[in-house]
Amino acid sequence: MDHFAYRSRSLYCENIPVAQLAERYGTPLYIYSKATLVHHLHQIQEAFKEVEPLICYSVKTNGNVALCKVMAEHGSGFDVTSGGELHRALPVSYTHLTLPTIYSV
């Protein structure tokens, strides 16, 4: 499932014209679809539910705190490899998870 689509030669993200977002926030601009992110996380969780996995989001991949918050809200733990990554993941972990789960090697 992808919540990005072209309509009448304009790109939309979750029914919002991307051009409108660029006009409001300027460019370059990173745009994420919360619905797409959550959908894919739930697919992974469902596929492995028999073994009760802890899916951990790699903060190194994208340390955006808003993305970390979405992942925590939907049951994700965090994979961190530095103090900075831990600093971003810990506050959302304590807020949204029953037991904060931070994994680091």
What are these regions (language model features)?
Residues 96-105:
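Single conserved hydrophobic/aromatic residue that forms the stacking wall/gate
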Residues 1-97:
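A charged N-terminal "starter" segment
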